[in-house]
Amino acid sequence: MIVRDFRQSDLNDLYRIASLSLDEEYAPEIFDYFRLQWPAGQLVMCLPDGRVVGFISSSKMDMSTAKIMLFAVDHTYRGSGAGSKLLDALKMKARMEGIRTIILEVRPTNMRAVSFYRHRGFVPAGILDNFYNDGGPAIKMICNF
């Protein structure tokens, strides 16, 4: 599998993966918005044939902090290392720009994601009440590297 920068031609694949993988609904334009915010923080995971199977979209919060806004891997490829490779690539891009902290939010009920992030250096930093559209809380997680 190959990690590369987001291309406009990836938009339909990203939207499909997000719609099938994430609890919240997002308009396709959200990917363009994040790309304009921080182009280096938009990565996709591709198979050798070019098919997109995962993505990570992030924003630069300040000179030393980035925030993962959306992160999803097609359910068929979960557990394959695709998510880890995407996160490692984001950390590398962030490090090259002087960023040393990445933050994110995750549902407390998404134990698989919470465990994934913990095993990759993220630690809980609080609970955000009424964070999601359905009123559900989020765990704020931080990784310093």
What is each PLM-predicted segment?
Residues 79-92, 115-119:
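Conserved acetyl-CoA-binding loop-helix of GNAT-fold acetyltransferases
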Residues 74, 78, 105-109:
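Residue-level recognition of the GNAT/N-acetyltransferase active site
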Residues 87, 110-113, 130-135:
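Short glycine/proline-centered loop/turn elements that form peptide/ligand docking sites
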